[in-house]
Amino acid sequence: MTDPVQNPYISPESIAEDAPGGSLSEFVRPGQIITFALVQGVLVITAILFLFIKGEAAAANPAAPNAPTAGGGDLVLPGIGIVAAVGACVIAFALRTMLRRTSINKYRKTETKPQEIASQDASLTPAMRQLMKNSQVGTLIGQVILEGAAVMNAILMVVDDNIIHLVPIAILVAGIVIQLPTVGKKRQLAKTATDDR
């Protein structure tokens, strides 16, 4: 009776490390929700800032229609936005590829009996669960890098009042969506990890 009540969610005894559990769908669904939230965030921020600059232009003083805006006619800020977008794409996909390769190598070192995943609800081994967690983290990092560059372009759009920033924003949003986790992609990852051992 002297044992305190323990929260099963934080108790180390609640889940044995070597017990099978989890499924592909448990790793896919949260990633899809996060992807939707990231895309929605970028689109909402961009729409609000776009409406802000359009509203500002409509309320401008009609006596001075040719008054220069901050950075108006200048290509420095659009150039910065495009370079940031290209850099973010390169970093996001290179980092994701590196993390994927590292996760697969770690899986191959720790898993003694490779697991074939029959269905999306099949129970995963601890090593396969860790592979899926690492894959989830790599995808999220890549998506967040792209989101940051997209928000930066939205802010630059307000600073220089130039809608050319919508082009890199659209490309970056497409990059976020391309990384959307699916059961097929996770099964392919598992197949790649178990093949060519």
Question: Could you tell me what each predicted segment is?
Answer:
Residues 90-115:
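Membrane-water interface of transmembrane alpha-helices
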Residues 111-145:
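Short membrane-interface loop/juxtamembrane segments of multi-pass integral membrane proteins
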Residues 1-24, 117-121, 194-197:
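Low-complexity, intrinsically disordered extramembrane tails and loops of integral membrane proteins
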Residues 72-90:
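Alpha-helical transmembrane segments
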Residues 32-41, 136-146:
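Select subsegments of transmembrane alpha-helices in polytopic membrane proteins
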